[in-house]
Amino acid sequence: MSSPIPEEFADFLSAKTSIVLPISSLSAMYFVYGFYILLFGAYIYTNFSRQRPVGEQPNSRLYLSLTLTLFVLATVYVVAYTIEVVSRSIVFFTVLETRNYRLLVNYLLHDSEKTVVFTLEDMSSVLLNIAADWMLIHRCYVIWSSKKRVGVPLVVASLGTNALGLIAAIIQAVAIADTSTDSAHSLYLLGNTLNAGYLISSAIVNSLITLLTAGRIWWTHRQVRDHGVHSSDRLVQRVSVIILESGILYPIAIIVNLIVVNSTDGVPPPFDMAPIVVLVAGIAPTMIIVRAKLGSNVGSLQDQVSDIRFTSHQAHREGRSQTHVYSIGNLSVATRDIEGEYEDRTGMHREAKEAIAV
């Protein structure tokens, strides 16, 4: 007859902790990662399936490098998390079979492999968030006609947020190396607190980026209509949905994770949401690019996204009336053209007044 499990180890060696939670967590993570693989494959296909306009090539190369970075870091995290879960399960099963509880104590207090894997997870998740912020902020900055008063505050907020995340990751790595002392345990709790602040700050920053981007699209559309330029309401609504549905995924995932972790009252959740949050950080910006590219390759929208057809300012001066057709993928160009057209009209009005005075 097997001896009963000591009470202090019962939570670690329960069926839910040692069997159900690892299986459900890995299943959920690989389901989301499988979707990410399909999304990344769609991006690679659409990115190289047709030649981009010359003016968009620098941005295209930037987004390509950032998207590759996001996917590589997400893959590193998936591998590290898998090693962590499998190694922990092996230790738990070995302890249950041999009743060698010293093995469990050594794993929990000072296991070098566990420390390396945990550190790799924390660092890759923060670096992935940095790359995601870079991509989203750059797109927001371009859509806002490269205005520094929009880009600089977002960059500063992102730097502060990710610096907090790096500090939390370093503190947790130091604490996990040896948790046998009270000081190490206190240090680990400090790292957890900083990490919670990092997640909340990241949710706020990404929400601001999403709202600014969607707001600028709406404003540009209104300006286009006010200047008598024809545009597709359906296309604008689609782009707004793209921004809101994909850009807002990351802060929503963070908020849900924080709610689940802090409302379980010691009861383990159905699965660990931490890897889901990390993967969504890569999926959200990638989905924006992919959905925009897929939309630009469908039917009659291809010409609208590929080209910007507009009337030159000289044609206005000669009294010719033509229709402006803008691509939502070139919002900053459309905005600059609207502003330039307004300046031309103002100058023409001033010249007319001077002619009348003479």
Task: Name these PLM-found stretches.
Residues 1-358:
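Intrinsic-disorder signature of cytosolic C-terminal tails immediately following the last transmembrane helix
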